[in-house]
Amino acid sequence: MKLRKIALVVLALAMTVLSAQAEDLTYSGSSTIGTGILKAGAADAFIQKSGINFTAIDQPGSGKGIQALLDGKVLLAGASRPLKAEEKQKKLIGTTIGYDAIAVFVHKDNPVKSLTKEQLKGIFTGQIKNWKDVGGNDAPIAPNTEILTSKRATVEMFQELVLDGAPYGAGLKQIDLPRDQIVDLARVPNGICSVSLGLLASVPADLKSKVKAIALNNIEPNDNSVRSGAYLISRPLLLVTPGLPKGPAKEFISFMLTAEGQNIVAKNFVPVRK
């Protein structure tokens, strides 16, 4: 009898542990969302409010995060781009929690204030190689980009919306993390790169002051132009689930759409609600 009671206690404890583990959240995907939202206060605020913990926040990029979700390795993926047709066919659901711009950055001493889409396309396909050809100084253009084979949303969206699907030019400097693209640009007066506007906040102040975002087609990336889509490289920030959100993933998504969650989004990005 005593052994039976002990066994029942052990079983109850085991079920409690398993239940607690089942409540944990795991995330993989966009570094824009991971760094600029989850690690910028959202995960901690959600833990405080719900008791549900994030045991993993991995940031391999939107494409790889979605694949991890499809493989059953995580409960929640992040995508800083719209879902592709083939992803929707796999019954994935994306919930928009905010908006972002892929901003074009140059060194602060660069006199160029705006580029057209065609000029930007020419730079990143290697057709335009000198700043004087786009209204700047007589100096070679030194573009950098994220790693082109990374399947990251910024690389794919920029290629689709700016390059019209054309291949990137040969010889682009490829950098693993978008934050490090800005760090590199701060040290290269003739440089240019395209990075999430929201991630600028993660760059040290002394380096951040050495770069500037420029207009695209004379439209600056700001709350109004990004939310309306007037800025060419605007994009939604999605939390992605396999089917309709449920369980801890649903709780977190619901939290991100509350006033508290949207205030966290607004620190670095454009919230869904004004």
Where are these regions (language model features)?
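Exported/periplasmic ABC-transporter solute-binding proteins
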Residues: A22-K274
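Small/flexible residues
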Residues: I6-A7, L237
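Positively charged n-region of N-terminal signal peptides that target proteins for export
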Residues: M1-K5
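Bacterial N-terminal signal peptides
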Residues: A7-V17
